[in-house]
Amino acid sequence: MIARDDITGLILAGGRGSRMGGTDKGLQPLHGTPMAMHTMMRLTPQVGGLMINANRNLAAYESFGVPVYTDTVPDFAGPLAGMLAGLEQCATPWMVTAPCDSPFLPTDLVARLAQAIEAEGADLAIPVTLDEDGRRQTQPVFCLMPVSALDSLVAYLSGGGRKIETWAASHRLAEVLFDDAAAFANINTLDELRTHETR
């Protein structure tokens, strides 16, 4: 059994925020609280500890009271670079990731991913949702992985790889169906943020 205390949560806040006009998405307020803080509040009860991957506004993220680590791969290499930074610093056997703009993530996310890894003998686990037409949508930026995946991630990034799904598929991967697709909604634009503000 994968115990909660054996899992560290990593909030991915290292992106450019290009679809939000270059603003730092994790620090944009939703109902008066930064989005990354909403994500932290959802994830905290599910893990033994937390850390943040960020590449700018480091003092602001450090004020959240958890360790902050920057990418060790240059040029904003995407979420996998953030995952790499997290794995390099992770002090527990397992790490789970969530993007900073996912303030509605399921409260049972980590437990269900951990159960699937155990039940299927998998290495990694990611959620899957269904869109309005019933098509499967993988949510690979939410990923439970062992720290031992570090070497394969280094090799994949060194070879120029950037897609989470491709890297994840090179392992024994458990895909866990979640009914509430809205729980995985990312807030990518200021218009989407305003829409959620009025709900």
Curated annotation (Swiss-Prot):
A GO molecular function held by the record: molybdenum cofactor guanylyltransferase activity
Binding site for Mg(2+): D101
Keywords: Cytoplasm, GTP-binding, Magnesium, Metal-binding, Molybdenum cofactor biosynthesis, Nucleotide-binding, Transferase
Catalytic reaction equation(s): Mo-molybdopterin + GTP + H(+) = Mo-molybdopterin guanine dinucleotide + diphosphate
Cofactor(s) needed for function: Mg(2+)
Keyword rRNA processing: no
Self-association state and partner proteins as the record states: Monomer.
Name the UniProt record assigns to this protein: Molybdenum cofactor guanylyltransferase
Organism: Cupriavidus necator (strain ATCC 17699 / DSM 428 / KCTC 22496 / NCIMB 10442 / H16 / Stanier 337) (Ralstonia eutropha)
